[in-house]
Regions:
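Non-catalytic, peripheral interaction segments enriched in hydrophobic/basic residues
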Residues: 67, 71-117, 121-125
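A conserved non-catalytic segment of reverse transcriptases
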Residues: 12-74, 78-81
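Extended C-terminal regions of large enzymes
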Residues: 104-105, 110, 114-181
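Catalytic palm subdomain of template-directed nucleic-acid polymerases
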Residues: 7-8, 38, 83, 87-88
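Single conserved hydrophobic/aromatic residue that forms the stacking wall/gate
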Residues: 1-6, 10-11
Length: 181
């Protein structure tokens, strides 16, 4: 029947895209890839990292008026599940970068929540910046993404604070899981 022929062609095309003859380090399988070293190591595929970033962007899109504890509760299951799936990964740098990107994104949410420069000044001073440095930072006129990656926000909202708030660190979770297994 025509329906069977159409579905057969769809399956054949899809499998052709997935199937290939190539070196192990040039193709990815189930979200993992391999390094090109003599002793190959498992790594997280670039596409998997991009898909996680897209998923987190979608989750963080509508959190501007929420408490940070609620935001962290919302993204933690995704981060924890992703870390447990990729616990076999042996590459450290992409996971460090991903953790940094998540914190950068959350600092961006906070910067947007503060909205006005006087509020930013008051909150930066409350978080430990000197008045002069907080004033320069709050009134610098740059955008939220730039400010969330700047030194003043890293100083005001360090990794220790995110750990205290309960944010799941992918690298720390993978290290903990690899010690257990």
């Amino acid at each position: 029947s025509a329906c069977l022929v159409g579905s057969e062609m769809c399956i054949r095309d899809r499998n052709r895209k997935k199937s290939q003859v190539a070196r192990a380090w040039k193709c990815d399988y189930l979200g993992y890839g391999m390094s090109w070293h003599q002793q190959p190591r498992l790594r997280v595929a670039r596409m998997s990292l991009d898909r996680l970033r897209d998923r987190l962007r979608m989750l963080l899109r509508s959190v501007r008026a929420r408490k940070m504890a609620t935001v962290i509760e919302r993204i933690n299951p995704v981060l924890r599940g992703w870390a447990s799936y990729f616990k076999l990964s042996q590459s450290k740098r992409p996971l460090e970068e991903l953790d940094g990107w998540v914190r950068h994104k959350l600092r961006c949410v906070i910067w947007r929540q503060w909205k006005q420069p006087p509020t930013r000044l008051r909150n930066l001073m409350r978080l430990g910046l000197s008045e002069e440095r907080a004033n320069k930072s709050a009134f610098n006129g740059r955008g939220p993404w730039w400010n969330s990656g700047a030194q003043h926000m890293n100083y005001a909202l360090p990794k220790k604070l995110w750990d205290r708030l309960g944010l799941v660190s992918i690298l720390d979770t993978i290290n903990r899981l690899s010690r257990v297994t």
